[in-house]
C-alpha cells in the first residue's frame, strides 16, 4: 500500500451536491463480488465471478475512497459479495482508518454475512469500526441453509458474539420473504433486541437473475408492520443512521426496528449515497443502470485531479429516483445486475 500515515485533524469538506440538491456524503464500496454464501435473492447458485485481473487492487480502492473522502464523503461502508473474504482486506481497512483518526471520516463500517466475523472482529474494532450490519434472515438452521444454499448458522452466531465482545455494535439486516421467514420475524426481533441489537427489515428488490417467481417472494413491509402492530407497540422515532431506514421503537422489547421500503415507500428523496463496485464502476442509483467508469480515470493518470473530475461528472447524472418494479408479466427484474456485484 502507498504511504498512509495518519494525517493531522482536518476540517470537514463541503459535500458534493447532486442535481436535486442532495448532499452526497455516503459511499458504499463493494470490495469483491465473491461470497461464501449463495443467498437466493442475491446471486445465482452457479455464479460466474469476475476474473481477478478485472478487480481494483487494494491500493486502487484506497486511492478511490480517499478521493471521495476529500470530496466530502463522511461515511464509508464496505460491502460485497462478502467483504471479509477478500484477500488481505484488513490491510485496506487498517489503512482507511487513518481518515477516522484525522477527522476526515465520521464512520468506517461494513455489511457482512457474519461467516468470517469470529476471525476478524478484534482487528475490525482495533481499526475503529464501531458498527456493522450482519445479514441474517432466519434463526432456523435448516431454513438458513436453504436461503444461503450452504451456510452454517452457528458460525454466523459465533461471529456476532465475537463482534459484540470486541465492542462493535451489531445491527441485524433481514430481508422479508413471503412464506419463508414472515412468520418468524417477531421471534427474530425478540432475539436481537434481547442482545442489544437493532433490526432492519428490507423488502426484496428486483435485481439479478431469479430462479422462481419474484412476485411469490415479495412481501410488502406495510403488511409486515401491520402484522407486528398486532403483537407489539410501535412508535415512530426520528432516529437515522445515514441510510434509508425509517425506525420505530418497540415498547415490549425496548429496541429499535427499521424498515427499508424501496418498493412500497420510495426513499429516494433523501438519498445521500453512491455505490462503487470492485471493478471501479460507480452507480449513482441502486435501481438504475447508469454508471461511470472510474477505473479508467484512476489508471489514466497518477494525479487525483482527473479522477475528481470524473466523479463530479458522475454525480451530475445522479437521478431523482430509482425504477424498481417487479415485472409480473415476464417474471424478470428491473435491474439485471446481481446485488452481489453492485454491493449489498
UniProtKB/Swiss-Prot annotation:
This is GTP 3',8-cyclase. GO terms for molecular function: 4 iron, 4 sulfur cluster binding; cyclic pyranopterin monophosphate synthase activity; GTP 3',8'-cyclase activity; GTP binding; metal ion binding; S-adenosyl-L-methionine binding. It catalyses: GTP + AH2 + S-adenosyl-L-methionine = (8S)-3',8-cyclo-7,8-dihydroguanosine 5'-triphosphate + 5'-deoxyadenosine + L-methionine + A + H(+). Keywords: 4Fe-4S, GTP-binding, Iron, Iron-sulfur, Lyase, Metal-binding, Molybdenum cofactor biosynthesis, Nucleotide-binding, S-adenosyl-L-methionine. It comes from the Bacteria. [4Fe-4S] cluster 2 binds at residues 268, 271, 285. GTP binds at residues 28, 77, 111, 171, 273-275. Belongs to the radical SAM superfamily. MoaA family. Catalyzes the cyclization of GTP to (8S)-3',8-cyclo-7,8-dihydroguanosine 5'-triphosphate. HAMAP family: MoaA_B (MF_01225_B). Its EC number is 4.1.99.22. S-adenosyl-L-methionine binds at residues 41, 81, 135, 205. [4Fe-4S] cluster 1 binds at residues 35, 39, 42. It is an enzyme of class 4 (lyase). Its cofactor is [4Fe-4S] cluster. Pfam families: Fer4_12, Mob_synth_C, Radical_SAM. Binds 2 [4Fe-4S] clusters. Binds 1 [4Fe-4S] cluster coordinated with 3 cysteines and an exchangeable S-adenosyl-L-methionine and 1 [4Fe-4S] cluster coordinated with 3 cysteines and the GTP-derived substrate. InterPro entries: Aldolase_TIM, Elp3/MiaA/NifB-like_rSAM, MoaA, MoaA_NifB_PqqE_Fe-S-bd_CS, MoaA_twitch, MoCo_biosynth_MoaA/MoaC, rSAM. GO terms for biological process: Mo-molybdopterin cofactor biosynthetic process. Pathway: Cofactor biosynthesis; molybdopterin biosynthesis. Monomer and homodimer. Residues 19-245 form the Radical SAM core domain. The lineage of its organism: Bacteria, Pseudomonadati, Pseudomonadota, Alphaproteobacteria, Hyphomicrobiales. It comes from Brucella ovis (strain ATCC 25840 / 63/290 / NCTC 10512). SUPFAM superfamilies: Radical SAM enzymes (SSF102114).
Amino acid at each position: 500500500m502507498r504511504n498512509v500515515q495518519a494525517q493531522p485533524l482536518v476540517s470537514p469538506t463541503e459535500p458534493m451536491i447532486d442535481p436535486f440538491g442532495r448532499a452526497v456524503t455516503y459511499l458504499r464500496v463493494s470490495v469483491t463480488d465473491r461470497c461464501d454464501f449463495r443467498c437466493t435473492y442475491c446471486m445465482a447458485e452457479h455464479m460466474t465471478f469476475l476474473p481477478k485481473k478485472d478487480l481494483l487492487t487494494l491500493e486502487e480502492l484506497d486511492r478511490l475512497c480517499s478521493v471521495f473522502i476529500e470530496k466530502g464523503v463522511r461515511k464509508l461502508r464496505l460491502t460485497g459479495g462478502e467483504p471479509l473474504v477478500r484477500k488481505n482486506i484488513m490491510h485496506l481497512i487498517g489503512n482507511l482508518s487513518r481518515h477516522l483518526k484525522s477527522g476526515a471520516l465520521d464512520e468506517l463500517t461494513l455489511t457482512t454475512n457474519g461467516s468470517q466475523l469470529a476471525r476478524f472482529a478484534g482487528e475490525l474494532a482495533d481499526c475503529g469500526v464501531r458498527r456493522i450490519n450482519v445479514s441474517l434472515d432466519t434463526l432456523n438452521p435448516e431454513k438458513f441453509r436453504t436461503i444461503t444454499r450452504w451456510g452454517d448458522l452457528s458460525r454466523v452466531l459465533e461471529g456476532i458474539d465475537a463482534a459484540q465482545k470486541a465492542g462493535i455494535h451489531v445491527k441485524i439486516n433481514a430481508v422479508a420473504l413471503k412464506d419463508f421467514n414472515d412468520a418468524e420475524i417477531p421471534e427474530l426481533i425478540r432475539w436481537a433486541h434481547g442482545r442489544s441489537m437493532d433490526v432492519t427489515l428490507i423488502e426484496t428488490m428486483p435485481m439479478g437473475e431469479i430462479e422462481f417467481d419474484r412476485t411469490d417472494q415479495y412481501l410488502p413491509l406495510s403488511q409486515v408492520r401491520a402484522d407486528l402492530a398486532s403483537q407489539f407497540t410501535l412508535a415512530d422515532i426520528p432516529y437515522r443512521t445515514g441510510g434509508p431506514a425509517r425506525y420505530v421503537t418497540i415498547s415490549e422489547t425496548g429496541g429499535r426496528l427499521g424498515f427499508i421500503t424501496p418498493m412500497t415507500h420510495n426513499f429516494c428523496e433523501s438519498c445521500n449515497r453512491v455505490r462503487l463496485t470492485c471493478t471501479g464502476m460507480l452507480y449513482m442509483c441502486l435501481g438504475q443502470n447508469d454508471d461511470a467508469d472510474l477505473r479508467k480515470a484512476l489508471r489514466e493518470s497518477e494525479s487525483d485531479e482527473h479522477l475528481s473530475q470524473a466523479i463530479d461528472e458522475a454525480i451530475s447524472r445522479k437521478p431523482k429516483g430509482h425504477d424498481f418494479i417487479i415485472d409480473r408479466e415476464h417474471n424478470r427484474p428491473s435491474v439485471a445486475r446481481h446485488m452481489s456485484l453492485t454491493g449489498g
